[in-house]
C-alpha cells in the first residue's frame, strides 16, 4: 500500500527499497521521510492514497505468527484482560482482528484515529489507561518495536519485547524491555514469572 501511494503521487519506489522500518511508527511521518519532503500537504495526500488500497486490500495482506491464537486463548481463560494498542487506525485494527478471528480474545481494541490522534504510542497508552481505568503497575506491554517499549515505560508499565517482529535486535536492546521472548507461546511462562516477582517485591 505504501508503494501504491507513492507511485500514485509520482514518487515510485525501487523494488529493492526495504520498508520494514515503516511498521510501528506513525505512518504519516514515514511517508514524509520516503517522499523526502517537509510538506504536510504532500504527506496527507500520500496517507490518503495509502488508505485507498489498504482499506480494501492491504488490510488482509498479513499472516498471523505461530501460536498467537492459542496463547491469547489461554491468557483469556486465565482471566487476563487483553487490550490491543496499535498505531493503526482503530477501524482497520478491528477489521484485521475480525478477519483472523482474533478479536474474540481482546477486551478492547485501541488504535489511532483517522484524523491522526493517538498515533504516538505513549499518548495511546495514556488514553487506554484512562479509558479502561487500568493500574499501570498491573499491566504488561508486549511489543516488537521500540515505540511499544518506550511508550509503555513512560507510564511505568513493565515491557516484554518480541524478537521475531519488525524491530531489530539493536533497537530492542536499546529500548531496554524487562525481558524478551522468541516465540509467542513463551509469553505465558514469562507473565507467570513476572507475577511471582511482583508478589515478592
What are these regions (language model features)?
Residues 22, 103-118:
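A short, structured active-site edge motif that brings together acidic residues
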Residues 141-179:
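Acidic, Mg2+-coordinating phosphoryl-transfer loop and its flanking beta/alpha structural elements
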Residues 1-69:
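N-terminal helical cap/lid subdomain that shapes the substrate entry/recognition surface
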Residues 12, 103-107, 135:
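Conserved H-loop
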Residues 77-80, 131-136, 194, 198:
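Glycine-rich phosphate-binding loop signature in dinucleotide/nucleotide-binding domains
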Residues 120-149:
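Conserved Lys-Pro-Asp/Glu-containing loop-to-beta segment of HAD-superfamily phosphomonoesterases
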Residues 56-84, 90-94, 122:
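Short, acidic loop-to-helix structural element flanking the phosphoryl-transfer center
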Amino acid at each position: 500500500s505504501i508503494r501504491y501511494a507513492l507511485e500514485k503521487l509520482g514518487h515510485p519506489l525501487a523494488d529493492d527499497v526495504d520498508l520494514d522500518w515503516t511498521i510501528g511508527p506513525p505512518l504519516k511521518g514515514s511517508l514524509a521521510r520516503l517522499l523526502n519532503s517537509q510538506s504536510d500537504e504532500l504527506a496527507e495526500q500520500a496517507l490518503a492514497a495509502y488508505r485507498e488500497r489498504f482499506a480494501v486490500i492491504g488490510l488482509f495482506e498479513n499472516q498471523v505468527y505461530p501460536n498467537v491464537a492459542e496463547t491469547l486463548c489461554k491468557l483469556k481463560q486465565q482471566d487476563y484482560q487483553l487490550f490491543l494498542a496499535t498505531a493503526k487506525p482503530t477501524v482497520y485494527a478491528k477489521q484485521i482482528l475480525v478477519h483472523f478471528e482474533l478479536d474474540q480474545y481482546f477486551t478492547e481494541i485501541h488504535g489511532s484515529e483517522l484524523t491522526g490522534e493517538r498515533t504516538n504510542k505513549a499518548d495511546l497508552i495514556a488514553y487506554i489507561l484512562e479509558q479502561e481505568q487500568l493500574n499501570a503497575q498491573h499491566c504488561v506491554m508486549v511489543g516488537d518495536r521500540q515505540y511499544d517499549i518506550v511508550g509503555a515505560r513512560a507510564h511505568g508499565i513493565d515491557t516484554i519485547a518480541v524478537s521475531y517482529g519488525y524491530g531489530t535486535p539493536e533497537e530492542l536492546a536499546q529500548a531496554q524491555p524487562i525481558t524478551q521472548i522468541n516465540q509467542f507461546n513463551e509469553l505465558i511462562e514469562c507473565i507467570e514469572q513476572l507475577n511471582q516477582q511482583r508478589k515478592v517485591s
